[in-house]
């Protein structure tokens, strides 16, 4: 039997449908072979955490809260909601009025976005449990139909909840800052520039994102130690 020669496209590493700790480690090794800068991050800090979140309404609420604020303040607001609701469900969320949500730490806009999300789920307009069977583009499009769910929120949900190996939140500030450092750029890249920079990392951009997040977090710790 004659073996078909590899095409140029075959040189890219293959990606699993869903990342696991084992496939994440394999992905780090694969990216290290094609990008010496990412290899340096892996040598310095090892394989990054999976940073997995459960699929569903609570994770999407938390991700909405994380839009353009510190992760610590978003988590604090979410924990206040969870303490009051016991279980964060669409039904429970809709029992809180705007004043109560503001007391938890929700801005007026984010309270509206989460309320619209809860209603979409209860009205049958959105079934988050079905997203795992969708392709990346379809899952992204389904999420972005919702008011308040933009590209960053959808990509982070794909990356952390659905564990898609090529999810890539190019608008993420921490990714941009880490990429500037790792790639020794003169300025923080824009989302479009980061997309272009990440092209060689397909179809494992979510693995690269975890490496860059790890670089960002470890870099901050080293700065504090100084």
Residue spans for each PLM region:
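Structural motif
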Residues: 50-58, 105-109, 198-206
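Buried hydrophobic packing segments
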Residues: 61, 114-117, 179
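Hydrophobic (often cysteine-bearing) scaffold residues that line and stabilize catalytic clefts
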Residues: 57, 61, 70, 74, ...
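C-terminal accessory module of base-excision DNA glycosylases/AP lyases that mediates lesion recognition
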Residues: 1-48, 132, 136-137, 151-226
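Non-catalytic interaction surface on structured domains
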Residues: 42, 52, 56, 103, ...
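Alpha-helical scaffolds flanking conserved acidic
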Residues: 25, 55-59, 139-140
């Amino acid at each position: 039997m004659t073996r078909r020669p590899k095409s140029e496209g075959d040189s890219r590493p293959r990606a699993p449908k869903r990342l696991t700790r084992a496939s994440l480690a394999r992905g780090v090794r694969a990216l290290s072979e094609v990008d010496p800068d990412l290899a340096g991050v892996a040598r310095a800090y090892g394989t990054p955490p999976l940073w997995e979140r459960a699929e569903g309404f609570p994770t999407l609420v938390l991700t909405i809260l994380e839009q353009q604020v510190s992760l610590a303040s978003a988590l604090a607001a979410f924990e206040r909601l969870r303490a009051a609701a016991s279980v964060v469900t669409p039904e429970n969320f809709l029992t809180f009025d705007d004043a109560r949500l503001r007391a938890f730490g929700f801005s007026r806009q984010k309270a509206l976005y989460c309320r619209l999300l809860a209603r979409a789920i209860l009205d049958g307009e959105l079934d988050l449990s079905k997203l795992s069977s969708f392709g990346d583009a379809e899952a992204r499009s389904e999420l972005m139909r919702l008011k308040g769910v933009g590209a960053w929120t959808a990509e982070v949900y794909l990356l952390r909840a659905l564990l898609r190996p090529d999810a890539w939140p190019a608008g993420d500030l921490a990714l941009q800052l880490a990429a500037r450092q790792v790639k020794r750029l003169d300025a923080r890249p824009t989302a479009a520039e980061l997309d272009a920079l990440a092209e060689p990392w397909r179809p494992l951009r979510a693995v690269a994102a975890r490496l860059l997040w790890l670089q960002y977090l470890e870099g901050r710790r080293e700065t504090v130690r100084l």
